[in-house]
Amino acid sequence: MEIPVGAQIFDLVFHPSHSTVYTALLTGHVKAFAYDAATHQDSFSVRPSKRSCRALTINEDGSRLYAAGKGKSIHTIDTVTGEIVETRAAAHDDPINRLKHLTPWLFATGDDNGVIKLWDPRQQESVRTHRQHFDYITDFLWLPDKHHLLATSGDGTLSVMDVRAKKTAPFAQSEDQEDELLAATTIKGGAKVVVGTQLGILSIFNRSSGYGDCVDRVPGHPSSIDALCALPPAFLESTTSFPGMENTVLTGSADGLVRAVQVLPTRLIGVVADHGDLPVERIAVGGGAGVLAPTLDEDKNEDKDGRVGKGKGKAKASSEDEEADEAAETGAGRWWVGSAGHDEVLRLTDLEAFFRNPSSGEGEGEASEDGDRDTEGSGDIDEEEAAEKDNEDEKEQPEEDSDGDDSDAPTARKRKRKPEKDPLVVRRKKGKNEVDVQGAFFDGL
């Protein structure tokens, strides 16, 4: 399913219990869409700032959505009506690049200068500030068993903060990995952390042995790995699993492909979604209720209890075609992979259907048997050209400020990609920590 949004998507989140997805756009808008197995509809569109919205996160019960971006403020949005209920102006000195809800009483923000702040939703001011990074924050990973917040950065390191501690020094910080760390998730039941890098390598960190350096490196992606997402435990429990499924991650790469990859032992399961030649910036997995949520016009007289998918929305869902009704009854399509990039389209892929019949791709971007390659070839997009493209996109928006482009966004630095699908410029020798991948790891992709 494809949902056109009209602008580049920087982030997306799913409602925790109902079929609604929220997107953060270059134009500064936050757009919400309700969906079922057959169709979708707009829920609301709100513009908290004229500057780009880069980051979203949603609280546990799905009643509040937090949005932030180049405007440096944090906006709290009602997830049903789209009403902005609270704004924390000038929350950072630099544009905010990442948001993460941690607990009912805590969420985190990270900016372009590497500053991380922890916030209590009940207070206007931040409760703690961390400054161990000197480049932009690319991703957050919450480790609830230890109350640890892991952050990755463009400075080549990851850090771990104990949110219960009062000190600002991190619990741990890795050595310089000599590569931009762009995304993080967990495998092995949370025992290992997988990190995506600019060079297209998956770096594996073992939590039990510390975060000083990675213990394994898995090459194979022909371009940078900009997004990672693990399969939710609820999905693993609700579907027929195969061996190693708990060690499977979804990867979003600058070559435009969303892949399902099993890690340790490593093998490509298939291509989940294809965004053409445009980079994939964000991936999320959502398991909704299987019915359309009410839009603002339909539900404006209903109680604003923070829930969606109730009330008049059910009446509309009941009028859908027989295929959608049957899918909702059987639960097919309940789990969706949302992927977004530079193509101004949100793609929703049926996750259960994919694992019933995994794709092996269409022969794009073949890799060598060890999957490795040099990413510093002459085909990289010039950063100034990427910035000019952002400027052109922004000028097309009628209400934007003259400085409202996102040309200095960290996403511009992550757009290094090759226009040609063949990544084999130079074959490097395998490093001491790299994992041997049996056969052609990404053969045919």
Regions found by a protein language model. Give the residues of each.
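Terminal intrinsically disordered, low-complexity extensions flanking WD-repeat/beta-propeller proteins
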Residues: 216, 222-226, 231-248, 256-257, ...
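WD40/WD-repeat beta-propeller blade-loop signature
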Residues: 8, 17, 52, 61, ...
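Short loop/turn segments that connect beta-strands within beta-propeller blades
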Residues: 35-38, 79-82, 121-124, 163-166, ...
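Short coil/turn segments within WD40 beta-propeller repeats
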Residues: 19, 27-31, 51, 63, ...
